[in-house]
Amino acid sequence: MSEKRPSLLGYSPALDGVRALAVVAVIVYHANKSWLRGGFLGVEVFFVISGFLITSLLIAESERNGTISLKQFWLRRARRLLPAMWVLLLGVAMYCSLFERNMLGNLRGDIIAALFYGFNWFQIWVGTSYFTAFDFVPLRHLWSLAVEEQFYLLWPLLMFVFTRVARRRLPVIGLLFIVTSIAIAIFTAATYRSGAIATVGETPEQYMAFLGHPVARIDFLFLGTVTRAGGLFLGAALAVFWRPWLLQTSPIGTRGQLFDGVFLAGLGGLAVSAAVFRDVVDTTDVGTTGYDLLFRGGFFFVGLASVAVIAAAVHPTATMAHRLLGNRVMTYIGRRSYGLYLYHWPVFQLYRRFAGQGLTPYEFVLLVLLALALTELSFRYVEMPVRDGRFGTWWRNRRAERGAGVQLSVATRRRRAGVLAVSVVLPAFALISLATAEVKLNDISQSLAESESAVVDLLEAQSAPTTVVQTAPIIVGGGTVTATTTLDGQLIDVLAIGDSVMLGSARELSERGATVDAMKNRSTRQALEIVNYLKSVRRLGSIVVIHLGTNSTTTEAVFDEIMVTLRDTPLVLFLTVHVPSEPRQTINNRLINALPAKYANVKVLDWHAIASQYPEYLYSDTTHLRPAGARFYADLIMQAIGRL
């Protein structure tokens, strides 16, 4: 008598191991991009896993029962996903109500969008790019869950139809899924534009209008449900064609070696992808550019590599996959991967406050342990009790106690009353605060807005006709530098060119005698345009101060072009950059520090080293200046050029 074969994949420890690989990659990437620049691709692995598992469940149910119960499927998904997410949203709202009240107004739309499974489209619509580094965005990571939740809503409907009208033609449906994934890859490649997708300091290239708002092309491609569904379709195709648990048990032999090879090929493909697709976008002096290969088949390639890893993980003869991915550590992480994904990003954000700030190894270990503790609490006391129906049992027992007239002890009544009070008061406070909060700028944005206004006023005052007065000699590095007058307008004796860092000290620099030209998101190349113009109208004076490189990675050629224009300027002072963005900081500072050896009139002020010693002068993004830091920064520059 033959043994009945299971109709559905049972528990697969190695598949949990695949989840673990994906979530660890994402967590490391979110902690510090320089550690694993392609770690964001872990999300694509999750998409393939979801497409595979959900389609497998739906096909198995159809074969077992002759139909698919849409209601039961959606209830199971809701019990699996919603409780932990609701706890997260409530927890973030309560934390911000107590400690980050200025951010509540900005958070309100994010929470509403997350509740209705539309966070990715909300993020596209409001134009808060996924790639901004200086925003407080504790829920930004929910975009990928929104993509999956939309899939969970629509996919059962499609599978219900497919299993009804084409039950005997599932292979054809599987081929259709593959063709659809290829079509998505082609559409993404055709929609993507190579080169600069946004000029530094300007609005990203608009792709289309969505409900009256401009949509940036790169946000649409990276965050959109349609363009990111390719992995889901590949996973669904795998579920149609690959159900090894239906096969008769066979010896490992050569078949095991074959699937070990498939596993290694897939794992190698993911490793190569993480190395090649180093980020989604990069900002250089040309502008913000995307990684062409990523949008021209890169996501599809990652999906194929994920298919290979998953196919091996669920096959009983793939011993290598089971050993590497099915051990206790990997399965522990994999079973909690949903909670880890949910909680790690808010923990990181509530600590560092700004998305682009990299964590140190010490901070990373502590914050991951905190996220893991929250995940474990959620797993034990929220996710599993809801999934197993324990909350319903508890509630029925409480009702039975009341119906039977059971007398509780005073201590028990007090304990329950205290828990009830906390469970009601804090959430109510958070919800009321959230509903009534105003949308505000964060501290950095507010400071920069005030500085921009000050710069406009200062430039208007400086551009007014005045009598040209020759300055007194000043001593710099042992030499004498004397400013001279021009016939074409007022000489700019000390010209300071910078980005948002210098913008934070614009008023202080002006009060100390400098003419300031600073703006947010400025690239190093834009300094060339400024000095070329001022030289053409003969307004360049004795000293030019340049502090750029926070927003873009520059090149030696750009600095050389600037110095060709400034070769006759007696003193050019460059400041190194201090920004939590690697390798940009290292590359730019290496180029800046090399300038004095090439140009005798160049001096370097090592702002990176100084700022590292005085973190109290910087906002929590470790880049922009607090008011006291603005004064300190201006004094440093004046000391460096001999004016203080």
Where are the language model's segments positioned?
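Hydrophobic membrane-embedded alpha-helices
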Residues: 3-5, 10-15, 21-438
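Conserved beta-strand segments of the P-loop GTPase G domain that flank and frequently precede/overlap
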Residues: 517, 544-549, 573-577
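Short, conserved loop/helix-junction motifs that constitute active-site signature segments
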Residues: 537-539, 563-569
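Short hydrophobic segments within beta-strands
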Residues: 48, 497-498, 547, 575
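Extracellular/periplasmic envelope-modification machinery, especially enzymes
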Residues: 192-195, 206-208, 237, 276-280, ...
